[in-house]
Amino acid sequence: MNTKIIDGTYIAERIKKDITQKVYADMNMGKRAPGLAMLLIGNNPISKIYIAHKKKVCKQVGFKSFLYNLPITATKTELLQLINILNNDKNIDGILIQLPLPDKLNDIKILEHIIPDKDVDGFHPYNVGRLCQRSPMLRPCTSRGIMTLLKWYNINTFVLNAVIIGASNIVGRPMLMELLLAGCTVSITHRFTQNLQVYVKNADLLIVAVGKANFLPSSWIKPGAIVIDVGINRLKNGNIVGDVHFPSAYKRAAYITPVPGGVGPMTVISLIQNTLQAYHAHVCCDSKKKIHFKKF
C-alpha cells in the first residue's frame, strides 16, 4: 500500500508563515501586536518545555507573549485574581493556563473564569457550546489542528465511519463535534467500551488519544484507513512514540500521522490561529467582523 505520511510539521510551518504576514501587515497599519498570556503554576519540567515552545512560536509570528509563572503554593484566589487582571487587559488577546494544574487547583471553574473571547484553548463552556451548536468560534486546539490536517491533504470526510478512542474534554469530545460537522458517522470509545476491536476494525477514520505507548494493535486497523495518532509518550529509552505502533500501522493505513511531527505541531499552531482570531475581534474597526461573546 502506498501510504502517505501526514506531515504536521510542514503544514504548521506553512500556516506560521501566513500568520506572520498577516500580523506584520496589521502592525504596518499602526495596530498593536497580538498578545498571548501564558500561566504556569509550579515548575513541572514538561510543562516548562511546552511553554518555552509556545513562547518561541509567538516570537516567530510577531506576537507578544507574557509568561506568569506562579509558585506551586499559589492559591485558587490568587490565580483567579490574575485571570481577572488579564481579562481586562486590552493588550492581551488570549489567555492559556498550562495543564495539568496542581491537584488543589484542578477546578473547572478556573478555566471557566477566562472570558470566552480570550479562551484561546477553546475549553470554556461557551466556546464548546458554540461548536456543539454548529457555529464555532474559538475551537479546541487539537481537534482544530486535526481537521486542518485532513483538509490540507484533501481528505473528504463526508460519510466516513469515524472512531475516536478516548473521550477526554481536551481531545475526544471536541473531536466528536468537529467530525459530526464534517459529515462523519462518529463513534467515541472510552475505558468502559466493550469489544473495542469491533469498533476499530470498521473505522475509515481512526483518532487515537489515550496516552499509552503503542496501545493499539495494528492488526485491528482496517486496511486503507486514515490513522490520526494524538498520543505523545516517552519510553524508558527516551524515545517519543504515539498510541499506535507506527511501523506496523504504516503498512495498513492509507494516511497516518507520525509521532512526533504529526498532531503536536498542529495543536500549537491552532493556538496561534485562535489568538490571531481573538486579536482581530478585539482590534478590528469593522464591527460586523467582531466576535460578540456573552459575558460570564
Curated annotation (Swiss-Prot):
Gene: folD
Entries under Pfam families matching the protein: THF_DHG_CYH (PF00763), THF_DHG_CYH_C (PF02882)
UniProt cross-references to InterPro entries, sorted A to Z: Aminoacid_DH-like_N_sf, NAD(P)-bd_dom_sf, THF_DH/CycHdrlase, THF_DH/CycHdrlase_cat_dom, THF_DH/CycHdrlase_CS, THF_DH/CycHdrlase_NAD-bd_dom
GO biological process: L-histidine biosynthetic process; methionine biosynthetic process; purine nucleotide biosynthetic process; tetrahydrofolate interconversion
Annotated signal peptide: none
Subunit organization: Homodimer.
A GO term, aspect molecular function: methylenetetrahydrofolate dehydrogenase (NADP+) activity
Similarity section: Belongs to the tetrahydrofolate dehydrogenase/cyclohydrolase family.
This protein's name: Bifunctional protein FolD
Pathway per the UniProt entry: One-carbon metabolism; tetrahydrofolate interconversion
Binding site for NADP(+): G166, A167, S168, I232
Reaction(s) catalysed (UniProt annotation): (6R)-5,10-methylene-5,6,7,8-tetrahydrofolate + NADP(+) = (6R)-5,10-methenyltetrahydrofolate + NADPH; (6R)-5,10-methenyltetrahydrofolate + H2O = (6R)-10-formyltetrahydrofolate + H(+)
The EC number(s) this enzyme carries: 1.5.1.5, 3.5.4.9
